[in-house]
């Protein structure tokens, strides 16, 4: 396993965490100042994995972000024999290294979309990058969806013109609730097992995916920060959040990988919304 690659990827995910948390706290401050409220701040808690490594959870519950969590983790060790065939390159000895960032934002306003993002670097006897970002509006707006996709398309096109259509398709297929026969949201991009034989290029792309999210999502949140919403709209948001829960518990690879590698359960399930209704 390449020590330098592990160090620079882990360092980037920490840096991106700091940038995202700073921007989200800034949004909370902007809203709080107009309402005479005390702005919310992220609360951080670290955890250690018994088999090796650990992570830091950053959680904020505020007036804008009902619940937003930004997790970073760097874990290593051996995958249990019963799960080794599910992770490429882990079949023989089960050794693995994984570092990454995951972010889920659930907003108080039903007019502001929920958002999920993660990027990661994994080494077994093989190595690869994966991740992506997707948007889940409860009241979709075309221009908002176009803006979100355009940010990721720009990041993709910088490296390969085939990336965006391929990764968009993979996102649409991945974030699909088969039992409901419906998509979870309006998509974005999703990629996995990315290894073009050029670590520097694949890493630079993964960094640009993070920068794309940082450029577009705060803008979307701010555009609807002060729009009024009704009790009926909030009720609909809570019901639709149920789909989020269903996907994460039934299909999400990150959830499965975290549980297979004895990750921190609180961090793994951080993506679940704070309040939800099932009808």
Swiss-Prot record:
Q: Where is this site: Important for dimerization?
A: 179
Question: Could you give a GO molecular-function term held by this entry?
Answer: coproporphyrinogen oxidase activity
Q: In which pathway does it act?
A: Porphyrin-containing compound metabolism; protoporphyrin-IX biosynthesis; protoporphyrinogen-IX from coproporphyrinogen-III (O2 route): step 1/1
Places the protein is found? Cytoplasm
Gene Ontology terms: cellular component: cytoplasm
- Which annotated residues bind substrate? 102, 118-120
Q: Could you say which residues bind a divalent metal cation here?
A: 106, 116, 149, 179
Documented EC number(s):
1.3.3.3
Q: Which InterPro entries match?
A: Coprogen_oxidase_aer, Coprogen_oxidase_aer_sf, Coprogen_oxidase_CS
**Could you state one GO biological process linked to this protein?**
protoporphyrinogen IX biosynthetic process
List of catalytic residues: 116
**Enzymatic reactions:** coproporphyrinogen III + O2 + 2 H(+) = protoporphyrinogen IX + 2 CO2 + 2 H2O
Q: Where is this region: Important for dimerization?
A: 244-279
Mind telling me which residue stretches traverse the membrane in this protein?
none
- Name any cofactors this protein relies on: a divalent metal cation
Q: Which UniProt keywords apply?
A: Cytoplasm, Heme biosynthesis, Metal-binding, Oxidoreductase, Porphyrin biosynthesis
Q: Name one Pfam family in it.
A: Coprogen_oxidas
Tell me if RNA-binding is a UniProt keyword of this record: no
Q: Which Gene3D superfamilies match?
A: Coproporphyrinogen III oxidase, aerobic
Belongs to which family? Belongs to the aerobic coproporphyrinogen-III oxidase family.
Q: How does it assemble?
A: Homodimer.
Q: What does this protein do?
A: Involved in the heme biosynthesis. Catalyzes the aerobic oxidative decarboxylation of propionate groups of rings A and B of coproporphyrinogen-III to yield the vinyl groups in protoporphyrinogen-IX.
Q: What is this protein called?
A: Oxygen-dependent coproporphyrinogen-III oxidase
Q: Which organism is it from?
A: Rickettsia conorii (strain ATCC VR-613 / Malish 7)
Q: What is the lineage of its organism?
A: Bacteria, Pseudomonadati, Pseudomonadota, Alphaproteobacteria, Rickettsiales
User: What is this protein's gene name?
Assistant: hemF
